[in-house]
Amino acid sequence: MPEAFERYSSNPTYEPPWRKVRFIGIAGPSGSGKTSVAQLIVKALNLPHVVILSLDSFYKSLNAEQKKRAFNNDYDFDSPEAIDWDLLFVKLLELKQGRKVDIPIYSFNEHNRLPETNTLFGASIIILEGIFALYDEKIRSLLDVSVFLDTDSDVCLSRRLNRDINYRGRDIVGVLEQYNKFVKPSYENFVRRQLSYTDLIVPRGRDNKLAIDMVINFIRRTLSIQSETHVKNIDSLQQIVPTIPHLPLNLVQLKITPEISAIRTILINKNTHPDDLQFFLSRIGTMLMNLAGDSLAYEKKTITLHNGNQWEGLQMAKELCGVSVLRSGGTLETALCRQFPTVCLGKILVQINKVTQEPTLHYHKLPRGIATMNVVLMASHLTTHADVLMATQILVDFGVPEENIIIVVYVCYSESIKALAYIFPKVTIVTAFLESVAEPVVGRLDIEKVYYGC
């Protein structure tokens, strides 16, 4: 790598929104409407990066004797001792660091944690709700806003009866016994004490629309500030690009042969039939995947020939995964699967806000164990680099080493390559056509529209 480029790329500055996650804690007595308030907030905002984290997920697993007591409604779930505070703190810290986190699933029917987990990643706002959300000092230290729902006890009891009977498989006698034995004493001894730690006390709980609107407006202001900061962060990368004199050495481009030049002419000709455009895009895609295959790591493998002799050949050193940046990356999936039939696939949906120009993560589905694989990240263009930049950051946050990522695109601008390589200097970029922002040719082609016909 040229010395000047190495110097610039040694200090990456990109900070995705989930690296500055904000926590909102909502506490209150059982049945006060914590879950309902959290759901109202999420529904009002209607954003994929505002999520709810229930304290119920962090109940401790019970041993045989404790389970027996629980099934007899004789186990105190309304005590702070029932919560695994250490695990909760570790998970919140990991979320604060922008990492992928596996959240446990607790079954109230089995009184145990299930082997499955829920994956949480990419959230900008996390609402932690539970009767003891503000109880633990370490947890409170991570919260940006704390809310306490102060609801009439009779209302709380009626809601608890409805929830436990209809959703947790309890009977009315057992619920009332547990309420009188554990819930009421817990409120006086533990839950109510959290009032002294709260920023906002909400009388009448979920029925207090004004207070809920205040919380929603706070979140909107926070997200607006995060959005402005994120866009400025991306813009700052563009300002650095002119100071980088060289393209990275890990840029791999198709050799410009007469065939490639002819295909380029066909692609940019406005009179080319759509069927021909699709055919030649597929042809270029196949060439790109051949080139990407040469960039993978291989290891020796000894096999037995049909005549019984031994032969030492090569095999891929790691399992291969293809990840499409939707929807443009889907145009390269067929070529990838044709070249590597056993490849596993993942999807990332990053959309650019038309008003703020901020990339936003809307969806991701990645194979388990992706951190140990070589990953081919596919997109049609690397022209406005924000979506591919965010997708690459997602892979890194899922534990994929930079050197195991190969970005494959039909066309890219030299400015976008420099910006991307400034942040991820070890990522390999494979492309067919290299252009500049000032003189785009193939870069003007709407590849997704041509490929999908819409």
UniProtKB/Swiss-Prot annotation:
Entry keyword Kinase: yes
SMART domains for the chain: AAA
Compartment(s) of residence: Cytoplasm; Nucleus
Record-given protein name: Uridine kinase
GO CC aspect terms: cell division site; cytoplasm; cytosol; mitotic spindle pole body; nucleus
Reaction catalyzed: uridine + ATP = UMP + ADP + H(+); cytidine + ATP = CMP + ADP + H(+)
Primary enzyme class: transferase
GO molecular function annotation: ATP binding; ATP hydrolysis activity; cytidine kinase activity; uracil phosphoribosyltransferase activity; uridine kinase activity
Gene designation per UniProt: urk1
